[in-house]
Amino acid sequence: MTKKAFLTLACLLFAAIGARAEDTPTAGRLDPRMRYLAYNPDQVVRLSTAVGATLVVTFGANETVTAVAVSNSKDLAALPRGNYLFFKASKVLPPQPVVVLTASDAGMRRYVFSISSKTLPHLDKEQADLYYSVQFAYPADDAAARQKAAQEKAVADRIRAEAQYQQRAEGLLEQPATTVGAEDKNWHYVAQGDRSLLPLEVFDDGFTTVFHFPGNVRIPSIYTINPDGKEAVANYSVKGSYVEISSVSRGWRLRDGHTVLCIWNTAYDPVGRRPETGTVRPDVKRVLKEVRG
């Protein structure tokens, strides 16, 4: 093989490799003059236009074209506007490089194009290699945005779940410890005295007494009435609008200054039997049988 033939073959191989290295935008389904491609910083993008026709390249919506370097600025006009770049060739141009820089909140991006122009008899969509518009897509950015949105949603869901859990926990703290049903409580209480201190309800489960006051009233001092008629300060815990005392008593005395209200347990059982079973255990029920003679 002669040296000239070798050089010719090498040039052909280089041209073929270069052609394959360029990224050609995909023609639109409705009009091949509308072109689309995914951004790849390692690829040279091929642009083809007609002499005298305008070609627009659309970058990411959050990008701004900051610099354009063309090889032949005399015969190729380049006009940036925001995330758009307009080209217009005034004469036939062989393929030549154009370098574009854009800026966004994410940083700088570089685009490298190989643009050429030719004379066409008309500019309809049947013309081959006639680009009117080239629009970039950003799959990696979209995937990162979806991942970020999913992570933010996961964090928001976790915060919401923690808040709901906290709300439920606070709600439980504001409820009395006696969680038995209404039929399992002793509601046999009567009041005597100043009814301005009257609770909404009073009940017990045989071991714990609960006073339920309106949420907007001041809770009075509570005393237990001993068998000798004397009163003793009752130790209680406040859970929201409920006051819980870990004992039962025949009578209670509520005081707020000179205002007094007595509450009597008409079903008082000093043994502390559960109302629903009649025994001290919830799993043991008292049953009365008829004695046959």
Swiss-Prot record:
Taxonomy, superkingdom: Bacteria
Topology class, membrane: Peripheral membrane protein
InterPro entries xref list: Conjugal_tfr_TrbG/VirB9/CagX, VirB9, VirB9/CagX/TrbG_C, VirB9/CagX/TrbG_C_sf
GO cellular component entries: plasma membrane; type IV secretion system complex
Keywords: Cell membrane, Crown gall tumor, Disulfide bond, Membrane, Plasmid, Signal, Virulence
Compartments reported by the entry: Cell membrane
Pfam families: CagX
UniProt signal peptide: 1-21
UniProt main location, coarse: membrane
Gene Ontology terms describing biological process: protein secretion by the type IV secretion system
Subunit structure: Heterodimer of virB7 and virB9; disulfide-linked.
Stated role: Is essential for the biogenesis of the T-pilus, which is required for virulence and T-DNA transfer to plant cells. When is associated with virB7, might function as a nucleation center for recruitment of VirB proteins during assembly of the T-DNA transfer machine.
Family: Belongs to the TrbG/VirB9 family.
Protein's name in the database: Protein virB9
Taxonomic placement: Bacteria, Pseudomonadati, Pseudomonadota, Alphaproteobacteria, Hyphomicrobiales
